[in-house]
């Protein structure tokens, strides 16, 4: 399929990406039309997809997309959550028209509704989940491309790309590979240099996980600010004026403070001490008119 050209052969880094994302892992069921894409069956019943056939079909699909003069005439669809982000990224990279989420019945056949469109090529993520657009495409003679698993029905599918269309990483990687090949065949990017866009941007992420990561990052930032605030607080400034000493051999002149003078008393001039042995002087106290004499 690649025409035996070295430039179109699958590179080692591409194989490693396929294996890391689990693109070669199919399901436990096998459709009779998908037998030609199977390499072997594991002991646990899972079918292994031949990545060489996957790469050949990927190049064929990219050539079909490039053959459309107006990129907006290519409709890419994914009703499943795992492929919606990848479809939007693919559309942004290639100029295609994305339909992420529920497909409105009659989009390709009912001319009355506002969402009516007439694309020239249709690309779907899962033939089983996206059966409605495939059926309508058959009514209007619309060529179709689909990412097919081992148990996917190939009815109304013109170009089937065998891969794992269940895993989020596998679906994102396949759309990334397809977008890269389309841009390469159009001459937008070079085959000699790697594409600067990472496959991670095409992967589906659970909104709950994203919210948890944002909360954890916010808490970590607050903790870091508090920690830095405790240790980086400015030291108190002492504004007391220090005496300037030009010559350190000379002593610092301490300002003299006058000593307060207190009057001194002559203890010798005090009167003689009373005789404590004498009886105290009688004092009269009135307690209910009575007097007490101390004798």
Swiss-Prot record:
InterPro entries found in the cross-reference section: Ribosomal_uS2, Ribosomal_uS2_C, Ribosomal_uS2_CS, Ribosomal_uS2_euk, Ribosomal_uS2_euk/arc, Ribosomal_uS2_flav_dom_sf, Ribosomal_uS2_vert
GO cellular component: cytoplasm; cytosolic small ribosomal subunit; nucleus; plasma membrane
Residues annotated with Phosphothreonine modification: 97
Region (Laminin-binding): 161-180, 205-229, 242-295
Major place of residence: membrane
Disulfide bonds, paired cysteine numbers: none
GO molecular function, one term: laminin binding
Residues where Phosphoserine is found: 43
UniProt crosslink position (Glycyl lysine isopeptide (Lys-Gly) (interchain with G-Cter in SUMO2)): 89
Gene coding for it: Rpsa
Gene source species: Cricetulus griseus (Chinese hamster)
Protein name, entry field: Small ribosomal subunit protein uS2
Subunit relationships: Monomer (37LRP) and homodimer (67LR). Component of the small ribosomal subunit. Mature ribosomes consist of a small (40S) and a large (60S) subunit. The 40S subunit contains about 33 different proteins and 1 molecule of RNA (18S). The 60S subunit contains about 49 different proteins and 3 molecules of RNA (28S, 5.8S and 5S). Interacts with RPS21. Interacts with several laminins including at least LAMB1. Interacts with MDK. The mature dimeric form interacts with PPP1R16B (via its fourth ankyrin repeat). Interacts with PPP1CA only in the presence of PPP1R16B.
